[in-house]
């Protein structure tokens, strides 16, 4: 089943809920896992039985299924703004619920989860909305529980001269996306947000995935290139919907794409992510 973005309630999501998106997210999952080595980086004691884990923005629950493999009888909850990709029937000990990060969470969920996880969702909100969402996610963790978030990051200043076309693309999107209610700088902000909402022991892992020719592993490099091209295609589609009086022109983005194609064919490109985690203060 395909659910188009126009049918999603109060959503800034720019991609349809269909098999193409499922394939893209599975490949993205595999890429990130290959470079982080594991799915749960927060220092949660994974030997404890009956851990309660929430995955916000779960899509089809694949992260939950994979993350649960080393755990003993975990209680898993997945949420998303659309039920279109929810597995039916759900896996054992797993429940799925419709939930937007901008809406109030169920009162019965407050202070109940050992781990609250979310990946690549906050960029689809404004900076203020992102901070509010993180505060609400933190409230779902039990005292002593953990919150782990993943967001994309822009190029570091030292990398901009190596990938000039990619830097131009980021700069264009950074100017364009606020008009869609997005925040491409979420990956730079999210670690600070964890501290701002009162979490402790905040940690961060920076993940860099070389794309195409820049990657010494041909398989991972090709996967990364396919994923990056898919995402860039979304921005191309979004730019075509800009109003005629917009200061951002689709033609400008097309020029950047031409240069980026040359860049990726000659030296490759780069994907960057921030994985951050923090602990809810324990009760005295």
From Swiss-Prot:
What is the name of the protein in this document?
Answer: N-methyltransferase sirN
**Protein's job:** N-methyltransferase; part of the gene cluster that mediates the biosynthesis of sirodesmin PL, an epipolythiodioxopiperazine (ETP) characterized by a disulfide bridged cyclic dipeptide and that acts as a phytotoxin which is involved in the blackleg didease of canola. SirD catalyzes the O-prenylation of L-tyrosine (L-Tyr) in the presence of dimethylallyl diphosphate (DMAPP) to yield 4-O-dimethylallyl-L-Tyr, and therefore represents probably the first pathway-specific enzyme in the biosynthesis of sirodesmin PL.
Q: Which GO terms describe its molecular function?
A: methyltransferase activity
This protein's pathway:
Mycotoxin biosynthesis
Keywords, comma-separated and alphabetical: Methyltransferase, S-adenosyl-L-methionine, Transferase, Virulence
User: Which family does the record claim for this protein?
Assistant: Belongs to the methyltransferase superfamily. LaeA methyltransferase family.
Q: EC number(s) of the enzyme? A: 2.1.1.-
InterPro entries named among the record's database cross-references: SAM-dependent_MTases_sf (IPR029063)
Instruction: Name one process (GO BP) from the record.
Output: methylation
Q: What class of enzyme is it?
A: transferase
Q: Which organism is it from?
A: Leptosphaeria maculans
């Amino acid at each position: 089943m395909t659910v188009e973005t126009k049918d999603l309630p109060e959503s800034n999501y720019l991609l349809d809920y269909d098999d193409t998106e499922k394939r893209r997210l599975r490949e993205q999952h595999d890429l990130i896992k290959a470079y982080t080595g594991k799915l749960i980086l927060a220092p949660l004691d994974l030997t404890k039985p009956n851990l309660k884990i929430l995955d916000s923005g779960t899509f089809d629950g694949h992260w939950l299924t994979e993350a649960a493999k080393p755990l003993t009888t975990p209680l898993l909850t997945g949420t998303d703004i659309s039920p279109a990709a929810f597995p039916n029937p759900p896996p054992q000990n797993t429940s799925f619920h419709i939930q937007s990060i901008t809406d109030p969470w169920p009162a019965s969920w407050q202070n109940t989860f050992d781990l609250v996880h979310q990946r690549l969702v906050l960029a689809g909100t404004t900076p203020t909305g992102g901070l509010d969402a993180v505060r609400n996610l933190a409230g779902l963790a039990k005292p002593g529980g953990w919150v782990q978030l993943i967001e994309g990051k822009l190029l570091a200043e030292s990398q901009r001269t190596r990938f000039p076309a990619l830097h131009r693309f980021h700069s264009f999107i950074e100017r364009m996306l606020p008009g869609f209610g997005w925040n491409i700088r979420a990956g730079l902000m999210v670690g600070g947000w964890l501290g701002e909402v009162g979490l402790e022991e905040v940690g961060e892992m920076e993940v860099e995935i070389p794309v195409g020719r820049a990657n010494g592993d041909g398989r991972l490099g090709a996967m990364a290139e396919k994923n990056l091209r898919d995402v860039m295609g979304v921005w191309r589609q979004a730019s075509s919907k800009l109003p005629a009086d917009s200061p951002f022109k689709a033609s400008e983005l097309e020029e950047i794409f031409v240069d980026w194609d040359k860049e990726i064919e000659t030296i490759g490109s780069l994907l960057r992510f921030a994985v951050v985690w923090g602990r809810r203060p324990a009760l005295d």
